[in-house]
UniProtKB/Swiss-Prot annotation:
Function as written in the Swiss-Prot or TrEMBL entry: Involved in the maturation of [NiFe] hydrogenases. Required for nickel insertion into the metal center of the hydrogenase.
Binding-site list for Ni(2+): H2
Binding positions for Zn(2+) per the UniProt entry: C74, C77, C91, C94
Family as reported in the entry's similarity comment: Belongs to the HypA/HybF family.
GO MF: nickel cation binding; zinc ion binding
Name of the protein described by the UniProt record: Hydrogenase maturation factor HypA
Gene3D superfamilies according to UniProt: 3.30.2320.80
GO annotation terms (biological process): protein maturation; protein modification process
UniProt keyword annotations, A-Z: Metal-binding, Nickel, Virulence, Zinc
Keyword Metal-binding applies: yes
Species the sequence originates in: Helicobacter hepaticus (strain ATCC 51449 / 3B1)
Length: 118
């Protein structure tokens, strides 16, 4: 369940940004989870709901998770495309089998909404 360590790191990163900007709290965290990242979005959500309670800055934080679809790249012609079958894909442009996953393996912090009181 590496999702727990991912969420712990995510909360630490968010707290660091919040403190850097003198935020009173973190209103919203938005992340993107790639379809082939190996991360279970439901477990991330569950872990976040638990761990946020231990953070004074995240007590009422909303977590928004966006799914990032897989995009493949042909290493022969450079064409980017989405495929139905990710275990075996052929470039629709040049019919090459020399393709790699270009997007969809990552987990990104997209945005933070901070409550800043002056």
């Amino acid at each position: 369940m590496h999702e727990y360590s991912i969420v712990a790191s995510l909360i630490q990163m968010c707290e660091s940004h919040a403190k850097e900007h003198n935020a009173a709290s973190i209103a919203k965290v938005c992340i993107a989870v790639g379809e082939r990242s190996g991360v279970d979005s439901a477990l991330v959500k569950s872990a976040f709901e638990t761990f946020r309670l231990d953070s004074p800055l995240c007590q009422n934080t909303i977590l928004e998770i966006q799914s990032q679809s897989v995009e493949l790249e042909c290493r022969d012609c450079g064409h980017y495309f989405q495929a139905q079958n990710l275990t075996y894909s052929t470039c629709p442009q040049c019919q090459s089998h020399n393709v790699i996953i270009a997007k969809g393996k990552e987990l990104h912090l997209l945005s933070l909404e901070l409550d800043i009181q002056s």
